[in-house]
Amino acid sequence: MTTCRLFAGFCQAVTMSKYSQYFNKTLIQVHYLTAKEMTAEELRDRIESKQSLSSLNILFVVICSIIILENLLVLIAVFRNKKFHSAMFFFIGNLAFSDLLAGSAYIANIFLSGPRTFHLTPVQWFIREGTAFIALSASVFSLLAIAIERYIAITKVKVYGSNKTCRMFLLIGACWVMSILLGGLPIIGWNCINNLDDCSAVLPLNTRYYIRFVVTIFSIILLSIVILYVRIYLIVRTSHQEATNSPAYALLKTVTIVLGVFIICWLPAFTILLLDTSCKMKQCPILNNAGIFFSFATLNSALNPLIYTLRSKDMRKEFLRVLCCWGLLNCGRPPHRCMVPLKSSSSMEHCTNKHEHQSIPIMQDCTTCV
């Protein structure tokens, strides 16, 4: 009843279609007041506060800017160097693009959070949060695609055939279609507008059932990826001893590290989301600090390019070339030759299919161990 006195206009519209309320700014205030169990005074203070960016937010804006630049470097490296024009590296490029999107989405989230949240319409709020979910979904699906590609490469299953490139890009496209669909479910209609009792405390316009569904889907996918990698390791261990020193095995170790870092960074955030589905704000005060856990998860997007750089000699060289071209390093490279695509006779296809390509020079030149 108190809520209705404060927001009489909302109570009159509560029986209307949820889509007709997508541009009602009052709706945001009602959902935050109810889901976060705030008093009217607390809500008013948050709306009227002139909060500037905190030092922590400024730090994460800097980190996200680094994330964008790092992953842009990965994309440029994959595009320029013919050695990286293989299924594996295109999937890594896809992961880099999702990380770049995550960095951009988090910057937007920082600038649209705090008191600014209450000046958003529901549709703007759904776009703000949905973009972050799309980036997360794309990362998870990219990791699944990489695991499938590694399994195919190790077991030498011939599934690509003559249409290898076409099928590879179809798989990447499917990753993004599924990600956009998953992140767009709330704005399509799976939200808690007109049903305040089901609202998430962390994401007050999303229903708890959607949060539970997303976390369940991600958990199943990550478990499937772990099973695939366990299967791959068993195959490698039982194969010829030489395989453990091959570039393909080094590549396998790198993507396993990427998976492990992803799980470590995102596990606290997933735990908070699961807690949110079964616990009210006053019963679980830790939900008030959910932003810290999501900030920690964002670090995953900054670590992936560092893993590629530390694990791959070719990737390090390519990063240095791009930095030289941008004038950040003095390498004495002629400017007109800076962005010329590099050609290489070796590729990860040669590394992966060692038994099919016995040419010694090719194997000696193949130093990519991402």
From Swiss-Prot:
It comes from the Eukaryota. SMART domains: 7TM_GPCR_Srsx. Keywords: Cell membrane, Disease variant, G-protein coupled receptor, Glycoprotein, Lipoprotein, Membrane, Palmitate, Receptor, Transducer, Transmembrane, Transmembrane helix. InterPro entries: GPCR_Rhodpsn, GPCR_Rhodpsn_7TM, S1P_rcpt. It is a multi-pass membrane protein. PROSITE patterns: G_PROTEIN_RECEP_F1_1, G_PROTEIN_RECEP_F1_2. Changing R150H: In mil; allele m93; lack of S1P-mediated signaling. GO terms for molecular function: sphingosine-1-phosphate receptor activity. The chain crosses the membrane at residues 58-78, 88-108, 129-149, 168-193, 220-230, 255-275, 290-310. Residues 79-87, 150-167, 231-254, 311-370 are cytoplasmic. One of its GO terms (biological process) is negative regulation of cell migration. Glycans are attached at N24. A lipid is attached at C325 (S-palmitoyl cysteine). It is found in: Cell membrane. One of its GO terms (cellular component) is cytoplasm. Residues 1-57, 109-128, 194-219, 276-289 are extracellular. The keyword Membrane applies. Receptor for the lysosphingolipid sphingosine 1-phosphate (S1P). S1P receptor is critical for cell migration and epithelial integrity during vertebrate embryogenesis. Receptor for the chemokine-like protein FAM19A5. Mediates the inhibitory effect of FAM19A5 on vascular smooth muscle cell proliferation and migration. It is linked to Defects in s1pr2 are a cause of heart development abnormality named miles apart (mil). In all vertebrates, the myocardial progenitors involute early during gastrulation and come to occupy bilateral positions in the anterior lateral plate mesoderm (LPM). During somitogenesis, these cells undergo a second phase of migration toward the midline and fuse to form the definitive heart tube. Defects in S1PR2 disrupt this process, leading to the formation of two laterally positioned hearts (cardia bifida). Belongs to the G-protein coupled receptor 1 family. This is Sphingosine 1-phosphate receptor 2. It comes from Danio rerio (Zebrafish). The gene is s1pr2.
